[in-house]
């Protein structure tokens, strides 16, 4: 009889604790999750600029209207691709015989990388944990970027040396 009462008491306590924890979790709005969920989606690149420290003017290595998308998934995956507003006028056959300076290509025509991401809402920092892409020196690194979310606009910028502006498309 005592075993039955103890078993019943244990079962009641366990069920009460589980119900109480679920009720608290479901009734509480998690501000951090809400902010991170606003980042999830596909963002179209509309500006990619760097400050020329000699002239003090912003330069647009990929042109005034760069092409590209940044995608952040619910599962924590990031994928980004950037290319210049004008492509290199070359055929596939000609490309086989052309020598290309990799740095010039990457910094003037096209690059991309992928991996996972994490967000520190309190510091407004998004970190891209790069696992692959066209920038070999980024692979297996953490690329921290300050960001601001304003409605459907994502600004990734340190407000000093670089500025990347994107609008949400999905």
Task: Name every feature range the model reports, one short phrase each.
Residues 1-2:
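N-terminal secretory signal peptides that target proteins for export/translocation
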Residues 5-13:
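Sec-dependent N-terminal signal peptides
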Residues 18-170:
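Lipid interaction determinants
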């Amino acid at each position: 009889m005592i075993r039955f009462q103890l078993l019943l008491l244990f079962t009641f306590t366990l069920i009460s604790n589980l119900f109480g924890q679920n009720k608290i979790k479901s009734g509480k709005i998690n501000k951090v999750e809400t902010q991170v969920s606003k980042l999830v989606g596909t963002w179209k690149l509309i500006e990619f600029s760097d400050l020329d420290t000699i002239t003090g003017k912003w330069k647009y290595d990929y042109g005034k209207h760069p092409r590209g998308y940044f995608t952040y998934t619910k599962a924590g995956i990031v994928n980004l691709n950037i290319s210049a507003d004008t492509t290199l006028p070359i055929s596939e056959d000609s490309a086989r015989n052309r020598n290309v300076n990799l740095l010039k290509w990457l910094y003037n025509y096209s690059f991309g990388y992928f991996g996972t991401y994490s967000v520190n809402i309190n510091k407004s920092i998004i970190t891209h944990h790069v696992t692959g892409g066209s920038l070999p020196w980024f692979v297996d690194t953490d690329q921290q970027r300050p960001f601001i979310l304003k409605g459907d606009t994502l600004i990734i910028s340190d407000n000093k040396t670089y500025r990347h502006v994107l609008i949400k498309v999905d």
